[in-house]
Amino acid sequence: SFLKIGDRAAGAIKSGGTTRRAAKMVCLDLDHPEIELFIDWKVEEEKKVGALISAGYASDYEGEAYRTVSGQNSNNSVRIPNEFFEKLEKGEDWELTARSDGRIMKKVPSKALWDKIAYAAWRCADPGTQYDTTINEWHTSPKGGRIRASNPCSEYMFLDNTACNLASVNLRKFFNESDNTIDVEGFEHTVRLWTVVLEISVLMAQFPSKEVAQLSYD
């Protein structure tokens, strides 16, 4: 599938001698007809890893066992609307629908699907969960369109074809242990300064497409 092709492409970028490995987020709506396969993808692949390690292959993440299987070059997440949790509370089935015309392709017990997500997350740390309804309720630019995905680590949610640069602030530097106070003014100044710095860095970046460049600028 194209999902596995994208995974291999990211792996090639990672091993291409660059200073930073590829970063890729893959999101799938919970009502997608192939959602069960998506949830189980890494679970099944890591079973193969276990078999290869038992056969004597290296167990480190850069070793042959992990390089051999798919699904190791992205963060996978499922987009869950509030409607699913309503079905879950009532013990009702969840409908999987065709992307082209919305036809119901299959009904699955909502609890079984939720248990599958929980088991997969425990077994191999994926998929992550993104709460689609809440994310779009908190959308700061709703007229621009729906938020359908995030950056690879899921801390930045925004429109399709937009870019983000990230920074971190050491909060301990603003905390005075002698009197248990926080330098609020210093923190506010730092946040304002870094917001400007990141805006400039985004605008100075080289974008992969005209659409990404324009929406990042706007």
Per-region residue spans from a language model:
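Long, compositionally biased non-active-site segments enriched in small/hydrophobic residues and glycine
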Residues: 189-198
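Active-site cavity-forming subdomains of large catalytic enzyme subunits
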Residues: 1-189, 203-217
